[in-house]
Regions:
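A compositional/biophysical signature of low hydrophobicity enriched in polar/charged and small residues
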Residues: 1-113
Length: 113
């Protein structure tokens, strides 16, 4: 399964509801992820730009996107960021593949030409 880093920011209304009725939202997240064929690896509360951070395993990008859409459609979050994760082994494999793809960057035109 593919790994994804999820970062979620709550709306002020969601914070108001949670402050007045504290609850563990990881249970709701876990249930939704599992219904999409995934698994929650870790889940944390945070502060700053994002209020919740988690690492989930999902069967594919479509399932990860569906989860992000479901969270967004619920209206409790002001932003959600999903980042696909790779192992270092996969990263090195990608570096080796990148070296063989033949891409060349744009070059500036020489002065006076």
């Amino acid at each position: 399964m593919a790994h994804y880093l999820l970062q979620v920011g709550y709306t002020p209304e969601t914070w108001k509801a949670l402050v007045h009725n504290p609850q563990d939202r990881s249970e709701a997240i876990t249930g939704a992820v599992e219904k999409l064929g995934g698994k929650v690896e870790r889940f944390w509360m945070a502060f700053g730009e994002y209020d919740v951070v988690g690492v989930v395993d999902m069967p594919d990008n479509v399932s990860a996107a569906a989860f992000a859409m479901a969270i967004s459609a619920g209206g409790a979050c002001k932003n959600i960021k999903t980042t696909p994760l790779m192992s270092t082994k996969e990263g090195i494999e990608a570096m080796r593949k990148a070296a063989t793809c033949g891409y060349t960057p744009a070059k500036a035109k020489a002065a006076g030409r």
